[in-house]
Amino acid sequence: MKSNQERSNECLPPKKREIPATSRPSEEKATALPSDNHCVEGVAWLPSTPGSRGHGGGRHGPAGTSGEHGLQGMGLHKALSAGLDYSPPSAPRSVPTANTLPTVYPPPQSGTPVSPVQYAHLSHTFQFIGSSQYSGPYAGFIPSQLISPPGNPVTSAVASAAGATTPSQRSQLEAYSTLLANMGSLSQAPGHKVEPPPQQHLGRAAGLVNPGSPPPTQQNQYIHISSSPQSSGRATSPPIPVHLHPHQTMIPHTLTLGPSSQVVVQYSDAGGHFVPRESTKKAESSRLQQAMQAKEVLNGEMEKSRRYGASSSVELSLGKTSSKSVPHPYESRHVVVHPSPADYSSRDTSGVRGSVMVLPNSSTPSADLETQQATHREASPSTLNDKSGLHLGKPGHRSYALSPHTVIQTTHSASEPLPVGLPATAFYAGAQPPVIGYLSSQQQAITYAGGLPQHLVIPGTQPLLIPVGSPDMDTPGAASAIVTSSPQFAAVPHTFVTTALPKSENFNPEALVTQAAYPAMVQAQIHLPVVQSVASPAAASPTLPPYFMKGSIIQLANGELKKVEDLKTEDFIQSAEISNDLKIDSSTVERIEDSHSPGVAVIQFAVGEHRAQVSVEVLVEYPFFVFGQGWSSCCPERTSQLFDLPCSKLSVGDVCISLTLKNLKNGSVKKGQPVDPASALLKHAKTDSLAGSRHRYAEQENGINQGSAQVLSENGELKFPEKIGLPAAPFLTKIEPSKPTATRKRRWSAPETRKLEKSEDEPPLTLPKPSLIPQEVKICIEGRSNVGK
């Protein structure tokens, strides 16, 4: 055994080593495992041993192939006696590199000047963690310490990482990563027990780091893995929602690691720039203990989200790019572990939650994305040894189509509920814009809608809820689910959401590629379908606002509270007299006809003193307040059935009354709207000083529009006539040449004498519009009751 001093000296860069260069190779070979002699064979390592995927032994067992055996011996059974000394080609080297293991890692690229790899002794506690302060050889490799190396010595990931490309394209960085993966598995911080998780992929595809390739425009990818500080022996891994964020600087580079609830894997493009190892040595050692702790916490957690840019099977990785390197959305990367105690752990009831933030490289070609998409799948337990996919500890699949503008797709087990609707701050440590998407298949803990088992939430001032499937959905084809209309979609033009399998069952990875949605995701040119209006769904099943419901409380202008069914004509008149802002508008029913649509009637009103003719389509059950008679509707039976509101039959000659604002401008109401005081109130309510009345009015407008999709909105305003005030939302107003008259009607605000006459068509719904208590009375008349609600 070497002395501690010798070992520490060997860990130093060549320039600072005190050991004679000639003594190192023989001594090092002497101390290496008997299988070390096989390392020479590791040159051909993975390219020549595609079948070694499932044979590589873990840190606790013998190796299957000689090349892997040699690595195993170096990394598992001795104190990291073999390490890579990576320094720029121009840096002088005090130790002859060719004498150590000349055939193991010769410079693979003849055209690119890269320094050869040599071994250096590293301490047991050495743990490699990429840091933002350095790039190059240490960039882009997640140490097996964090990865929780599998029971088999050498993962197929290592094979694919180093052997996927031909020697002409494989950089020393790749060779370094493969060796590092094995070396990292041997060192464990004392006191931390680590149980070997299921086999996992190194997460690095062939040609990922090509020194000669230009860095992508978007260089940072973030994988945010959230887990609770539980033992590493967790039987099953939690589901992983995926979050996509377009910003590179979302996560700070300098973060500390510890047994926290969150781990962030940050990928930074090194651009093939290599720096001397000594400049990064201290940073690595300082993070060693933290990395060890993270491993215990994460164990299998990180593995499941680290399958990016890697082929699902070794053959696929080894077989492709034999003559050319494949561009990837992820170039050389840095690993940063970031604890966020305030993250999921505080919100998750189940204790362990995994989340993934992915920042795709916008420069990645769609062809490569297709390859990744086809290969980024989780292998089922039966194929775990054959495919180097990630395994969540339970059957299922997760596919990442990481195109430049693509929102993720993920699978969650129904047995592990995942909270929905969490704010963007739950996932991001910095004050960055909200995540683009949050996908969950949770069926219970849904705060937005109890019936949505799986949906996409786009956080923002008004969170956007996008249903993306149902619990029994077997295919991600339902990705193009209905999306609630929201202006936020303007900011997410290139987003395509695909649903995932919520079931806990084996998923055939091949089925994914066949789905039509996936090619679309790869292209990243698909826009989320946006429903034209929230009222559209309502159109199918129109419903009236609840204020017409019997028992709803209406507040009159004088402050008196009355039930909607107890309103009298005097209440309207008194409210108009007491209030300086309200007046009674009347509309006379001139004609009632059946509409071509079932359950809809066409009513023609003569509005105001000018008798402006307005035709309105209204639901037959919509109640109007008739002067001297009370509530009336075209179909009293339906009204009584729906609202339990006693109604009379609306007939020609009836004068419908409603309270409207006196100060409404002539042009404030649109075509046909002037006739409807309710619509006038609605418009005014928007600008009215009274929040309560405004709220009621808004409710009326929304309820009407949504309840009966028949109402058309023009420039955001309801088209139904004012007289119908209450029914306005349910009606579709057909404006006749009497528009000017309608405008005049607004001018009527002065003539209070006609209040009774005008009251024909104006429903009490207009009342809620006014901000004053009289407006509330109006609401009462219209049937809209805040108190009732």
Swiss-Prot record:
One GO cellular component term? nuclear matrix
Polar residues: compositionally biased ranges: 218-235, 310-325, 360-386
| UniProt KW Ligase keyword | no
Reading the lineage from the top rank, the first entry is Eukaryota
The UniProt record lists the AXH domain at 536-667
For this protein, the record's PROSITE patterns field holds: AXH
Q: What is this protein called?
A: Ataxin-1
